[in-house]
UniProtKB/Swiss-Prot annotation:
Topological relation to the membrane, as annotated: Multi-pass membrane protein
A cellular component annotation (GO) from this entry: membrane
Taxonomy of the source species: Eukaryota, Metazoa, Ecdysozoa, Arthropoda, Hexapoda
Name of this chain's protein: Opsin-3
Keyword line: Chromophore, Disulfide bond, G-protein coupled receptor, Glycoprotein, Membrane, Photoreceptor protein, Receptor, Retinal protein, Sensory transduction, Transducer, Transmembrane, Transmembrane helix, Vision
Organism: Manduca sexta (Tobacco hawkmoth)
Keyword Zinc in annotation: no
Residues carrying a glycan: N4
Amino acid sequence: MATNFTQELYEIGPMAYPLKMISKDVAEHMLGWNIPEEHQDLVHDHWRNFPAVSKYWHYVLALIYTMLMVTSLTGNGIVIWIFSTSKSLRSASNMFVINLAVFDLMMMLEMPLLIMNSFYQRLVGYQLGCDVYAVLGSLSGIGGAITNAVIAFDRYKTISSPLDGRINTVQAGLLIAFTWFWALPFTILPAFRIWGRFVPEGFLTTCSFDYFTEDQDTEVFVACIFVWSYCIPMALICYFYSQLFGAVRLHERMLQEQAKKMNVKSLASNKEDNSRSVEIRIAKVAFTIFFLFICAWTPYAFVTMTGAFGDRTLLTPIATMIPAVCCKVVSCIDPWVYAINHPRYRAELQKRLPWMGVREQDPDAVSTTTSVATAGFQPPAAEA
C-alpha cells in the first residue's frame, strides 16, 4: 500500500499533495502503523491514507510545545499570583481574569502528554491517554471561550453603568461557577461515550472529539458542540462589546453637547477622566484577548466542520496540527496582553518584579493626586 501511494505521489507530482510529508526512513509505513492491533479502532481510516510523519517533525513539535508550556506557565502563574494577592486588584471583575488564567493553565497540562507522545511517535496510554488529553483540552477550550463572554459582559456593565452596574463578589462567583458548568456537558459526554467520543487526530499524538465518523449521530454532535462552544460565546462577546462601544460613544456625545451649551471645554473632572481612561484601557485588554480567541479557535472550528460536513481531502495531518498549535498559542499570549496594557497589573508588576522593566504609574495614585491638586486650587480673588 505504501509503495502504491509513493508511486502515485511521484506520478501526479508534489502539487497534488502539498502538505503530505514523506521521509525515507518512514516511507514504508502509514499513519497508525505503530499502534497495537487491539487499539487500531482508535485511528479513523482517513488517517491511514497518509504516510507516517518523520520523527524529526515530531521532535520539532515537541520543542514548540515545550516553549509554549514554559511561556504559559510563567505568564499565567504570574497573573494568578498578582491578581489573587494584590489588594488593588482584588475585585469582582478581576476574578474573571484569574478564572481565564486557570483555564489557560489547564490547557498547558496537556503539554507534557503531547511532548511524551511526540518522542514515542504515538499515543502513550492509548484510549486512556487520549481521553485525559482531550478532557483537559475540552474543559479549558470551552471554559475559556465562555469566560471571554463573561468578561465582555462585565466590561459592558462596568463602563456603561459605573455606579449601579458593577458586579459584586457573589455574582462573580456564580458566573465563574457557570463557566465551569458550561464546559462540562461536551467534556463528560464524549469522555464516557454517552454521546460522541475522543479519538486521535493529525500526527496521532493529539486527541479531540470524533468529527470523521460518517453517521447522523456524529454529525449532530459536531454541529451542537460547534454552536455551544464557538457560536454562542462568539455571539455574546460581539453583542456585549458592540453595546459597550455604543455606550461609550453616547456618553461622550452627551458630555460634549452639554459642555457646548454651558460654554465650557469639558464637564468631566480630571479624576473622572482618569478613572474612565483606566476602565477603557482594561476594556481594550479584554477586546484584544477576544480577538486572539477568534484567531486561535476559528481555524480549528473550520477543521472540525470540514471533517464532518466538507471536503475531507483538505485535512492532511499537518493541516490539522497547525490549528491545534494556534489554540495553545493563545493561552500563552493572554497573560502577556495584560502585562502590556492593564494599568493596575502593570503597576503591581513594577512593584513586585522590577527586573522585568515595566514602567507604569499607579492609576489610583494618579487619581488621588489629581483630586487633591484640584481641590487645593483656589482661583484668584477678583479685584475690588
